[in-house]
């Protein structure tokens, strides 16, 4: 899915029922295919096409507010929800005493697909983080998101767990790295408040 296109702005914070967006996600190149219709993620277990390199919409069949784009992309759940791995992955780090709002920070490396080797972080108001070293399938739960505090943020990181834009970020900045994650998530079927059509859907180029 490593593609580029131009930026269109959307209105501010909007509530999203991710289940309604599922067809758009399923149609995107590289998205995990069949959905059981039972609130699952489309992952069908070991040996499936999902396990071999396709990706899932981590918010499918859930209701979230899409927030701002900064170092990553902010979301607020309307209920307690599982946070799901986008693809087959290895958890590189899991910290419940970080300096992030809410104190929680987890990062994982994708092991299959056209984003193989890319590292994704999930941070902020979480609980029950999966420990470092765990390997997970597409759509498998890696943490629980709580409908309180600052919600969660999802973006690109390096193997040490530093966000890609950390070295150049100032509070409230809409970074290139954040737009890249927004593009990737939107292609999977997740809503974003600003569709970054000119940004690539993977971590490359300017950090901020």
How would you name each of these model-derived features?
Residues 76-79, 84-85, 110-141, 145, ...:
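Short histidine-centered loop motifs in beta-beta connectors
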Residues 86-129, 149-156:
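Zn2+-dependent peptidoglycan hydrolase active-site motif and core
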Residues 27-106, 137-138, 178-208:
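Surface-exposed, glycine-biased beta-strand/turn segments
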Residues 1-27:
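Secretory targeting and sorting signals
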Residues 152-170:
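Short, compositionally biased
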Residues 141, 148, 158-160:
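Internal hydrophobic scaffold segments of catalytic domains
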Residues 167-181:
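Polybasic, proline/glycine-rich intrinsically disordered low-complexity segments
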């Amino acid at each position: 899915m490593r593609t580029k296109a131009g930026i269109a702005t959307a209105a501010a914070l909007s509530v999203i029922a991710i289940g309604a967006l599922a067809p758009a996600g399923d149609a995107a190149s590289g998205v995990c295919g069949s959905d059981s219709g039972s609130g699952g993620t489309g992952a069908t277990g070991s040996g499936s096409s999902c396990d071999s390199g396709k990706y899932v919409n981590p918010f499918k069949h859930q209701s979230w507010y899409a927030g701002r784009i900064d170092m990553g992309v902010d979301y607020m759940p309307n209920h307690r929800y599982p946070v799901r791995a986008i693809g087959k992955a290895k958890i590189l780090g899991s910290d419940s005493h970080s300096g992030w709002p809410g104190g929680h920070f987890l990062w994982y490396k994708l092991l299959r697909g056209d984003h193989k080797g890319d590292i994704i972080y999930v941070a902020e108001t979480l609980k029950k983080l999966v420990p470092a070293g765990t390997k997970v399938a597409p759509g498998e739960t890696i943490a629980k998101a709580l409908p309180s505090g600052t919600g969660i943020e999802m973006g690109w990181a390096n193997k040490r767990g530093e966000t890609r834009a950390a070295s150049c970020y100032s509070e409230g900045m809409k970074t290139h790295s954040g737009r890249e994650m927004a593009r990737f998530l939107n292609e999977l079927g997740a809503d974003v408040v600003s569709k970054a059509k000119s940004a690539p859907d993977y971590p490359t180029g300017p950090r901020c």
